Amino acid sequence: MTNRHMVSLLLALSVGGAQAQEISTVNTTIDCGQVVFKQPVTAEFVLNNSGGQPLIISDVRTDCGCTTVSYPKTAIPAGERFKVTTTYDAKQMGHFNKQIGIYSNAGDNPMMLSLKGVVVPQISDFQGEYP
């Protein structure tokens, strides 16, 4: 086999042999709005394995211990949707913006998600009669 044929064969195998995994989502940020102080808030991110191979999530990291995450521990088939559930423990008053990094075989860089809102002492309801 000539060098030209060998290079062509190797190039064809590297391009067509493996379709990269990819994670996609409609929303990378969920705004929780007002959250009552000391009342945890939970949000679900709906994601999709939009690659051609099974997706394996190796790790999910948060930027602080006040946020917990639940995610699939098994391989996610190509084209399948899956959920990443996050819970923020609202123990501090004020605005929050928590980052969640999803590490997988979809690439070297994590997919970043964020959960934001504002922790308040009580939620004001503006319904009722006005003078």
Feature locations, PLM:
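Bacterial N-terminal signal peptides that target proteins for export
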Residues: 1-7
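Bacterial N-terminal signal peptides
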Residues: 8-16
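Long, low-complexity ectodomains and other extracytoplasmic segments of secretory-pathway proteins
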Residues: 19-40, 44-46, 52, 107-131
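Beta-strand-rich interaction surfaces with strong enrichment in secreted/lumenal proteins
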Residues: 32-33, 71-76, 88
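Surface-exposed loops/turns
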Residues: 37, 78, 92-93
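Non-cytosolic beta-sheet module surface loops
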Residues: 49, 88-90, 104
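Surface-exposed binding patches on compact interaction domains or structured appendages
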Residues: 52-81
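Ligand-binding face of N-terminal immunoglobulin V-set domains in extracellular IgSF glycoproteins
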Residues: 82-88, 96-101
